[in-house]
Amino acid sequence: MTDRVRASHILCKHLGSRNPVSRRTGRPVTIDKESALREIQGIITQVKNDPGKFALIAQERSDCGSFSRGGDLGFFGRGEMQKPFETATFALKVGDISGVVDTDSGIHVIMRTG
């Protein structure tokens, strides 16, 4: 069993997110959860078609502060992330990209990198 994983992600915040302010723009988000879901589904299609662009898309689109690192969250262990995020990441193989992952922070797509 793996104790630690490394992942990158793209976060789309919405009005119901626990802190509905984009770390990339510094402005409050204005979209509802349905719109965020549609946005992340489009992003998932893009990154699954061209995984090499994950970091670039994260820099351009993610609402998480990790946008400046191309979405890289570094290594983390169990209990360090919100449970749905942790479960999805640990279920992926290195290089795999998740589907939609919904947490209190917003809606994510995750790529396991280590």
Functional labels for PLM-detected ranges:
Residues 1-32, 84-114:
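Proteostasis/folding factors centered on peptidyl-prolyl cis-trans isomerases
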Residues 38, 42-83, 114:
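Peptidyl-prolyl cis-trans isomerase
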